């Protein structure tokens, strides 16, 4: 069952979302921001200003998810102007960022991550795997810029929405099976096998 704001707030009070914003934030110091925080049936997390990487072409190489070469990624520059802090995701490229919020998923829940419409209308597709039962850490966020124009990715502002689904307790959680992305730190985690 999809969980509501009351359930999400209780999860946060137990340390399940940290830091936690108990309402939708749309402005900071009279400046409009891409919304983040608690909504009726979800929670919008923010993009960290600390780590954003963009794929680059390395002649003679092919990206191999089984033997991922970190050299295929380059750190993006954090820019700042009156609109806020942002990274630039070039046209037709792919970038990896990390969430500001740390998550601890209950044993009987799974979190599905979906893109925000503000970014989707600019050609940005968010592709984040679900956070399964008992997963904990900082989500690595994956973004594809499908448009023919470069796009700003705003740090410290909303970037994806989390939907929380509760079910019957599972027999083996992500933590139990020692999932390879368990305990991710507040930095981009590259592909693992």
Predicted regions and their residues:
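Non-catalytic terminal segments and appended small domains
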Residues: 1-193
């Amino acid at each position: 069952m999809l969980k509501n704001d009351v359930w999400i707030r209780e999860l946060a009070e137990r340390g399940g979302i940290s830091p936690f914003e108990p309402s939708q934030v749309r402005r900071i110091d009279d400046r409009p921001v891409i919304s983040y925080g608690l909504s009726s049936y979800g929670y919008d997390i923010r993009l960290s200003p600390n780590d954003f990487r963009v794929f680059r072409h390395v002649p003679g190489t092919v990206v191999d998810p089984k033997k991922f070469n970190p050299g295929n990624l380059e750190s993006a520059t954090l820019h700042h102007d009156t609109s806020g802090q942002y990274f630039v995701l070039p046209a037709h490229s792919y970038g990896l960022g990390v969430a500001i919020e740390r998550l601890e998923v209950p044993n009987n829940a799974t979190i599905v991550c979906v893109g925000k419409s503000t970014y989707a209308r600019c050609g940005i597709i968010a592709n984040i795997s679900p956070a399964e039962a008992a997963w904990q850490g900082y989500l690595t966020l994956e973004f594809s810029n499908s448009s023919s124009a470069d796009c700003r990715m705003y740090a410290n502002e909303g970037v994806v929405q989390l939907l929380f689904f509760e079910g019957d307790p599972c027999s083996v959680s992500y933590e139990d099976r020692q999932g390879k992305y368990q305990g991710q730190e507040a930095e981009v985690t590259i592909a693992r096998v």
